[in-house]
């Protein structure tokens, strides 16, 4: 029982350590924020298209 506090302290120290990406960056790596921005712009574009067509999407926008 005397080593339980030491174990808890070590567990807390290792869990709160900074997370480091172990992989080396390459020129093809894209930051996650770029993916989020692309997803937001795609969703915005799709919402704009559905807004101009209304609730029924039987024909593309601008075509009757």
From Swiss-Prot:
- InterPro entries assigned to the protein according to its UniProt record, in alphabetical order: T-conotoxin
Chief localisation class: secreted
Q: Where does tissue-level expression of this protein occur?
A: Expressed by the venom duct.
Molecular functions per Gene Ontology: ion channel regulator activity; toxin activity
The family database entries (Pfam families) matched by this protein are listed as: Chi-conotoxin
Q: Give the sites modified to 4-hydroxyproline.
A: 60
Propeptide cleavage-removed residue intervals: 23-49
Q: Which residues form the signal peptide?
A: 1-22
**Which domain of life does this protein belong to?**
Eukaryota
**What protein name does the entry list?**
Conotoxin Am1.1
- Species whose genome carries this gene: Conus amadis
